[in-house]
Amino acid sequence: MLDKRKFYINGKWVSPSKPNDLEVINPSNEDPYAVISLGSKEDIDKAVKAAKTAFESWKKTSKEERLKLLEKLLEVYKKRFNEMAKAISDEMGAPMDWATEVQTGSGQAHLEDFILRLKEFNFDEHFDSKSSNHICYEPIGVCGLITPWNWPINQIALKVVPALATGCTMILKPSEIAPISGMLFAEMIDEAGFPAGVFNLINGDGAGV
């Protein structure tokens, strides 16, 4: 059984504040195949503190700096594509071909699209050549992101990647029913070299987190 009890907070895999195990079930055979921890308020507080601290420097990064990291993330995602497909197949009980082509493929497609959109996006937009007025787009701050079990990496990519692209920091809580793909994505974030605290992950249920 996979031991996935730790959370990703401030660039490190850390143990929860208090033990609270939950088995992850493969719906295709109804067998447990992994164990995670359900987080608490104390864990959330640690992640929020890390995200708030990281935001002060992350919000000042240039578009080019964020693009470089997202392109590295895409490279890592492609390298570990089959791992992601296997994680999704197990946690959803989904056929491997569907988990690969539709589920994991959508995550890659969203990453590629957001990279393209970021390249095209102007964060400082003038109204017209005759006016000195302009719109300056700024990151909003720390984002709390919750994703469902049925389109795990699809929804993670749709929420996490644009937040990263715009200079926000975040805490992700994937579905406790299908959390392994999210934890693998956290490993990819780490491997890509994002600064500590920019992305944090805590597992948990609705009542606790």
What are these regions (language model features)?
Residues 1-124, 128-131:
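N-terminal Rossmann-like NAD(P)+-binding subdomain of aldehyde/semialdehyde dehydrogenases
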Residues 123-209:
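Rossmann-like NAD(P) dinucleotide-binding subdomain of oxidoreductase/dehydrogenase enzymes
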